A protein has these predicted regions:
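Histidine-centered divalent-metal-coordination microenvironment in nucleic-acid enzymes
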Residues: 1-2, 31, 152
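Glycine-rich, proline-tolerant flexible connector loops at the mouths of alpha/beta enzymes
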Residues: 1-15, 168-170
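Acidic-and-aromatic substrate-binding clefts and catalytic sites of carbohydrate-active enzymes
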Residues: 5-8, 36-38, 65, 89
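Well-ordered, non-membrane alpha-helical segments in soluble/globular domains
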Residues: 9-13, 43, 119-123
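Glycine/small-residue-rich loop that forms an oxyanion/phosphate-binding "nest" at active or ligand-binding sites
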Residues: 20, 27-56
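A short helix->loop->beta-strand "cap" motif at the edges of active sites that frequently abuts
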Residues: 24-26, 78
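Catalytic alpha/beta core domains of metabolic enzymes, predominantly
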Residues: 58-164, 169-184
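Expand to "…catalyze enediolate/carbanion chemistry for C-C bond making/breaking, isomerization
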Residues: 186, 190-192
Length: 195
């Protein structure tokens, strides 16, 4: 696919099967981002044709067709991770009626947000106000990646880090690979001030 994201059944199946063979106990998630197909109808058509299913999918509650997508995934036995990038997304999730069917909340503040920590906290306040107690994973992209990861550690949320999120280490130097990013995240999580 030349490095492009896809929801096409064959490459998705091949990827999931390869990961399961290599790491059989690793839960596998796929994104369902609308930017991949640019059409909510096309996205549904492709996912309906999946022959090998991930354990769960990330569903962005800012996108059109979210309810239909959640219905399809749940009917196929695929879990939902609710992707929230704003307070409006948090409210959309709460209003959707899918909160109780989600596995986790994915807080991913939009790149370029002036105060990403405050934006993430605002999303969390909406969730807490509605009694949403699902596990949370919080991450950011680019220069927001490390501050949001550290904030997630402080709050006891799950984290993720990789080249999809940032190409640099906390000190701003280039990372050689994903393993170096993960090692840096582990050092932050184990820092004495975090104990």
């Amino acid at each position: 696919m030349g490095g492009r994201e896809t929801l096409d059944p064959d490459p998705c199946a091949a990827t999931i099967e390869a990961i399961r063979e290599s790491c059989p106990d690793l839960p596998i998630s796929l994104t369902t981002g609308l930017w991949i197909t640019r059409s909510s109808e096309r996205r549904l058509e492709l996912i309906e044709r999946w022959s090998v299913l991930p354990d769960f999918c990330s569903v962005n509650f800012s996108e059109d067709g979210t309810n239909e997508l959640c219905d399809l995934l749940l009917n196929r036995g695929v879990g939902i991770e609710a992707g929230l990038s704003s307070v409006a997304d948090a409210r959309a999730l709460i209003d959707s009626g899918y909160v109780g069917q989600c596995l986790r909340i994915l807080i991913e503040v939009e790149p370029g947000t002036k105060d990403p920590i405050r934006a993430a906290a605002a999303i969390c306040r909406v969730l807490e106000g509605a009694g949403v107690r699902l596990p949370r994973l919080q991450h950011g992209m680019g220069e927001q990646a490390w501050p949001l990861l550290e904030d997630a550690i402080v709050h006891g949320y799950d984290v993720r880090i990789g080249f999809e999120d940032t190409l640099t280490l906390p000190d701003g130097s280039p990372a050689n690979d994903n393993a170096e990013l993960v090692a840096a995240a582990l050092r932050l999580a184990k820092a004495p001030s975090r104990s």
